[in-house]
Amino acid sequence: MLRLPPLAVLLLLTLGACQAPDPLVKPSPTNSPELKSQLTLTNATLEQANAQGQPLWKIQVQSAQYTPDRKQARLKTIRGDLYQDGKVVLKVKADRGEIRDNGAEILLSQNIVALDPRNQAVLYSQEVVWRPQAGILTARQNFRGEHPELVVTATEGRYETGPQFLHLTGQVQADAAEKKLRLTSEALRWEIPNHLLIGAQPLKLVRYSGAEITDQIEAPQARVHLKNRQVFLPNPNQFKSLQPPLQITAQNLTWFYDEKERRLETFSPLTILDYQEEITITGNQGRVDFAQNQVWLTGSTQALSAKNQSRLFADVLMWNIPDRTLDASGNILYE
């Protein structure tokens, strides 16, 4: 075993045609071409540790070609582990790579796969940079992330290995719940342990039943709880359902997108428009149950039919969507 400071390189290798200088030969005052030559290792295991002796990374390579100062190296056929606090946080493989700045940065390129064994998230890209001291893996080309709860693509992905948060930027697309829900935006944060997807920039949500779109919404912000299959929309939003044909406007909407519990709930004023029958109903709070095809509204409710110019006021309204019938109770007034 041979260690090459400062990279703390454990060599399990067969030296190629180029051999290291005779250790008994002292360097001359002049810059010797022999001493300045590159070191090439084959079938080597390389590792780096922090000041406390904890591993930062450990990789096996087909070949490693070092610069004369031994602070940089070009790598081929890489497979290994990336660490944080002495524990493996990513298992990686790639076709090419580089050790930079005395091991403070690892660049991987071409056919990269990175698996987090703690949560089973798999990250794919054509170029990533690992900064062990920061615990951040940045993917810059053709990024894709896969997990049992979610599949994402983006121009760039930045993975914080400590909290296990994935930050996505540029043409982001996220498919959840076996492609029942698709979210698109320019930026998202995926908190993997919390089963949470956060969009702080304008985004679009589309719900599918098979290949057919059932619901869609454009919103300035959203929080998607992947485990519970619900979306919280905190700002004024306009929700459009194609099955049934409803348009719902409200603030602070909670949307349950599971097939068996598909519904909307809000404790703020809302307006519901049946855009085929031209019926509008409003209330101070309400619930739309798509699975049961029913709507409940309470608090200063009213229903307006544009076709027959009629209006109904009540404390409580229940609307049966398929046959367009209304049940009213409390302070009823019909015009």
Predicted regions located by residue number:
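Mature-chain termini and adjacent capping regions
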Residues: M1-E335
